[in-house]
From Swiss-Prot:
SUPFAM superfamilies: Aminoacid dehydrogenase-like, N-terminal domain (SSF53223), NAD(P)-binding Rossmann-fold domains (SSF51735). This is NAD-dependent malic enzyme. The active site is at 101 (proton donor), 172 (proton acceptor). Divalent metal cations. Prefers magnesium or manganese. The keyword Ribosomal protein does not apply. It catalyses: (S)-malate + NAD(+) = pyruvate + CO2 + NADH; oxaloacetate + H(+) = pyruvate + CO2. NAD(+) binds at residues 154, 267, 415. Homotetramer. A divalent metal cation binds at residues 243-244, 267. InterPro entries: Aminoacid_DH-like_N_sf, Malic_enzyme_CS, Malic_N_dom, Malic_N_dom_sf, Malic_NAD-bd, Malic_OxRdtase, NAD(P)-bd_dom_sf, NAD_malic_enz_proteobac. Its cofactor is Mg(2+); Mn(2+). GO terms for cellular component: cytosol. One of its GO terms (molecular function) is metal ion binding. The gene is maeA.
Length: 562
């Protein structure tokens, strides 16, 4: 029986119901419910449907003139009536996605302490390191199945935001529900408050976090370890998503925990999965395979290298040797292209550094090879930006790339929009409409020579909700590399451009539920094949996905005796 059709029995009544966002219906409580739950007189006389409530809320939403105010308004609805919030967002998903998440959520993080209104999620501060179990038990969410956790050190392209980073887990989990059908009752945002090195926050009298420089080293490692163990004790089957950890911690934490717990890092693995999925769709539209491409990255941090490793894995699966695949991937950071003789390369960068012997015949060969030099010598067919540095995909670089590649694939993925390496408008004009473009933040369509080009947003929201749904439906105990690769291929299968030869590189957000279910099935199938979940038939797996898919509809309430 569908949960939305089954009555929910509540052991409390009166104003407490109206203060519980997971339960509150506002003006939609029926006459019978108002009598049984002592709500008569606490609400206006008229009984409304959820659509009538959503219509009023949307009218109010449209009265706000700036995006941050719209974000705050929607968060207020979320904190009072979550079912209405998700119905409203789902009714206007394309319009509201940039408001509830990037780019607007970045501003909300910067102003988190100043605009703080109501508690949501858990804040686990380092001074309370010995009481983590008690803190987890204080959560109002008892059946947690998905956790998004951050320490606030690398929030989007904005750097250290301390506890202001809580806006990211809240926003990410909103997308798990809006896009992936995960019940909000199963979600929990968590911020690990380990201090901040942001002097503006330390000096701000309104800052609500632990006013202390960030801990590091062994103290930090032991604190995160205590957190992970406590979460596993409290919710042993929960999926944990690491979010916006600094480069120095992101990869080590992922390597430490990915084989111990059901977890993944969205900045590294989610970004890689959606990028590979988008590239597979772009390659199909261009009539090629990924293994035939030469790829240049601007940005060689954990996110960029994570994408590069996923690309290498996909190229190998298409039939070329790993050594050859690595020769076709060129990583550029602030010091130039990564080369094997460079000192101080991080472990995850070393495998992606080019062998100096292979590039000695390049023009302008030196210790510091610029992005333009890489474009002129390596002649890449794909250019990916994850640098967080705006404007570095210059007209000279894009035109140099286009001179040797008829249909260049250009992905300036940095967030927010103020950090993008080049705008889609510039890229398409510089290439006379020939480039295949996807961005990390939303952009309006671009018109070149009377042709309108839809700009795909290479947003992780196409991937992680489906991964979460697949993990829940299958009961998977791990998130493996093969499961992530399956999500990429499933996303590519949904591309309008690769299917029809026209339209956007990625599906419309209005189709996100269908896309998430398709990805969930692919992810769950691989989880079963690898032994991370119990075997089941395709039919039962599809049914499990449907059964786990929550919709924003009010349930009937019955009162228990008390």
């Amino acid at each position: 029986m569908d949960d939305n059709k089954r009555p929910l029995y509540l052991p409390f009544a009166g104003p407490a119901i109206l203060e519980a966002p997971l339960i509150n219906k506002g003006s939609a409580f029926t006459d019978e419910e108002r009598i049984f739950f002592n709500l008569e007189g606490l609400l206006p006389h008229v009984i409304e449907t959820i659509e009538e409530q959503a219509s009023r809320a949307y009218d109010q939403y449209k009265n706000f003139t700036n995006d941050l105010d719209k974000h705050i308004y929607l968060r207020n609805i979320q904190d009072t009536n979550e079912t209405l919030y998700y119905r409203l967002v789902q009714n206007h998903i394309t319009e509201m996605m940039p408001i509830i998440y990037t780019p607007t959520v970045g501003m909300a993080c910067e102003r988190f302490s100043k605009d703080y209104r109501r508690n949501r999620g858990l804040f686990i501060s380092y001074p309370n390191k010995d009481r983590i179990d008690d803190i987890l038990n204080n959560s109002t969410r008892q059946k947690v199945k998905i956790i998004v956790v951050t320490d606030g050190e690398r929030i989007l392209g904005l750097g250290d935001q301390g506890i202001g980073g809580m806006g990211i887990p809240i926003g990410k989990l909103s997308l798990y529900t809006s896009c992936g059908g995960i019940s909000p009752a199963y979600t929990l945002p968590i911020t690990l408050d380990v201090g901040t090195d942001n002097p503006h926050l330390l000096e701000d009298p309104m800052y609500m976090g632990w006013r202390n420089p960030r801990i590091g080293g062994e103290e930090y490692t032991e604190f995160v370890e205590a957190f992970m163990q406590a979460v596993h004790r409290r919710w042993p089957d929960a999926l944990i998503q690491f979010e916006d950890f600094a480069q120095k911690n992101a990869m080590p934490l992922l390597e430490r925990y990915k084989d111990q717990y059901c977890c993944f890092n969205d900045d590294i693995q989610g970004t890689a999965a959606v990028t590979v999925g988008s590239l597979l769709a772009a390659c199909k539209a261009a009539g090629t395979q990924l293994c035939q491409q030469r790829i240049t990255f601007l940005g060689a941090g954990s996110a960029g290298c994570g994408i590069a490793e996923a690309i290498v894995a996909q190229m190998v699966s298409e039939g070329i040797a790993e050594s050859q695949a690595r020769k076709q991937v060129f990583m550029v950071d602030r010091w130039g292209m990564l080369q094997s003789n460079m000192p101080n390369l991080l472990p995850f960068q070393q495998k992606l550094a080019q062998d100096c012997d292979d590039i000695t015949n390049w023009d302008n060969f030196s210790e510091n090879i610029s992005l333009l030099d890489v474009v002129n010598n390596a002649k890449p067919t794909i250019l990916i930006g994850v640098s967080g540095a705006p404007g570095l995909f210059s007209e000279e670089i894009i035109k140099a790339m286009h001179s040797h590649c008829e249909r260049p694939i250009v992905f300036p993925l940095s967030n927010p929009t103020s950090r993008v390496e080049a705008t889609p408008k510039d890229i398409l004009h510089w290439t006379k409409g020939q480039a295949l473009v996807a961005t990390g933040s939303p952009f309006e369509p671009v018109v070149v020579d009377d042709i309108t080009y839809e700009i795909a947003q290479c947003n992780n929201s196409y991937i992680f909700p489906g991964i979460g749904l697949g993990v829940l439906a299958a009961g998977a105990e791990r998130v493996s590399d093969a499961m992530l690769m399956a999500s990429s291929r499933a996303l590519a299968e949904c591309s309008p451009l690769s299917i029809n030869g026209e339209g956007s590189l990625l599906p419309q957000l209005e189709d996100i539920h269908k896309v998430s279910k398709h990805i969930a099935f692919a992810v769950a199938k691989v989880a079963i094949e690898e032994g991370h979940a119990l075997p089941t038939s395709d039919e039962l797996l599809s049914q499990a996905i449907e059964d786990n898919f929550w919709t924003a509809e009010y349930r009937r309430y019955k009162r228990t005796s008390f």
